Structure formats: C-alpha cells, structure tokens
C-alpha cells in the first residue's frame, strides 16, 4: 500500500510501497525513502533510539515517536483536525494531503 491515513502508524520495519519506491520506518528510528536500494531522503534520526514508530496524526502532522512516545522528528504540518493522508506517489514524492473542502455527499454509509 502507498497510503497512510490519519490515525494510522508504521511500526519498525513497516513501509509504504509504490513499485520501486519504499518509504520505511527502520528499526534504528530513521524514516527513509528508497529508490530501489538507494536512499534518497531521510529524517536523519537513525541511532537516536530503537523501535520508533511513525504516526499520521489527525491534525495533519507526520511524526516519528520514540518507544516512550517522545517526538523525535515531525513534518511540522499540524493544523486543524481532519482527514489527512500521507501518500507515496508514483513520481517518488511523499506528500501529505488534507481535508476535503467539498464533496457531492453521495457516499454510501
């Protein structure tokens, strides 16, 4: 899957995958985007702790937490509560999208 929804987490070793690209929460607390085997972006939090997790929060902030729930990295995109998604796109970019502003209202409950 290539989407992390509000309220969801990535535990150590879990990842978003979109073909050749992988966005992984590593065991060493580093969040890394890989193009095949080549790291192309990272939070540079490796070695700060072990077994951290990534959280897509309902305020739109993407945060790496230590096992004691201390934030060690954040996207600093927190705002109003809503529905947000973190998407690993086909163009290799990882993007946080926010709450929908309009809909037809024709969804089925």
From Swiss-Prot:
GO terms for molecular function: D-mannose binding; protein homodimerization activity. Gene3D superfamilies: Bulb-type lectin domain. Alpha-D-mannopyranose binds at residues 26, 28, 30, 34, 37-38, 41-42, 44, 57, 59, 61, 65, 72-73, 76, 83, 89, 91, 93, 97, 102. Keywords: Antiviral protein, Disulfide bond, Lectin, Mannose-binding, Plant defense, Secreted. The keyword Magnesium does not apply. It is found in: Secreted. GO terms for cellular component: extracellular space. Residues 25-109 form the Bulb-type lectin domain. CDD domains: B_lectin. Detected in bulbs (at protein level). A two enzyme-linked immunosorbent assay (ELISA) (with NPL bound to the solid phase and a Galanthus nivalis lectin (GNL) as detector) can be used for the quantitation of human immunodeficiency virus type 1 (HIV-1) coded glycoprotein (gpl20), and possibly the quantitation of free gpl20 in medium/sera, and screening for compounds and antibodies which interact with gpl20. When labeled with fluorescein isothiocyanate (FITC), can be used for the detection of very early stages of apoptosis, especially UV-B-induced apoptosis. The keyword Transmembrane helix does not apply. Strongly inhibited by alpha-1,6-linked mannotriose. Inhibited by various oligosaccharides of P.pastoris mannan including, Man(alpha-l,6)Man-alpha-O-Me, Man(alpha-l,2)Man, Man(alpha-l,3)Man-alpha-O-Me, Man(alpha-l,2)Man, alpha-1,2-linked mannotriose, and Man(alpha-1,6)Glc, in order of decreasing potency. Weakly inhibited by elsinotetraose. Not inhibited by maltose or nigerose. GO terms for biological process: defense response to virus; regulation of defense response to virus; response to virus. Disulfide bonds join 29-52. InterPro entries: Bulb-type_lectin_dom, Bulb-type_lectin_dom_sf. PROSITE patterns: BULB_LECTIN (PS50927). Binds to the mannose portion of the glycoprotein (gp) 120 of HIV-1, and inhibits the attachment of HIV and rabies viruses to susceptible cells. Has a significant inhibitory effect against various viruses including HIV-1, HIV-2 (IC(50)=0.6 ug/ml), and SIV (IC(50)=0.5 ug/ml) in MT-4 cells. Also inhibits human CMV replication in HEL cells (IC(50)=1.2-1.6 ug/ml) and inhibits syncytium formation between HUT-78/HIV-1 and MOLT-4 cells (IC(50)=3.3 ug/ml), and HUT-78/HIV-2 and MOLT-4 cells (IC(50)=4 ug/ml). Homotetramer; antiparallel. D-mannose-binding lectin which binds alpha-D-linked mannose. Displays a high affinity for alpha-(1-6)-mannose oligomers. Able to interact with both terminal and internal alpha-D-mannosyl residues. Displays antiviral activity and therefore may contribute to defense against infections. This is Mannose-specific lectin. It comes from Narcissus pseudonarcissus (Daffodil).
């Amino acid at each position: 899957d290539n989407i992390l929804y509000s309220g969801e987490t990535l535990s150590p070793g879990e990842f978003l995958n979109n073909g050749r690209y992988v966005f992984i929460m590593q065991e060493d607390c580093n969040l890394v985007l890989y193009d095949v085997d080549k790291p192309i972006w990272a939070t540079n939090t490796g070695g700060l702790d072990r077994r951290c997790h990534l959280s897509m929060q309902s305020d739109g902030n993407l945060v790496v937490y230590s096992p004691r729930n201390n934030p060690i990295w954040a996207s600093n995109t927190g705002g109003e509560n809503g529905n947000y998604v973190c998407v690993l796109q086909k163009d290799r970019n990882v993007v946080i999208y926010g709450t929908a502003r309009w809909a037809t209202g024709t969804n089925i409950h």
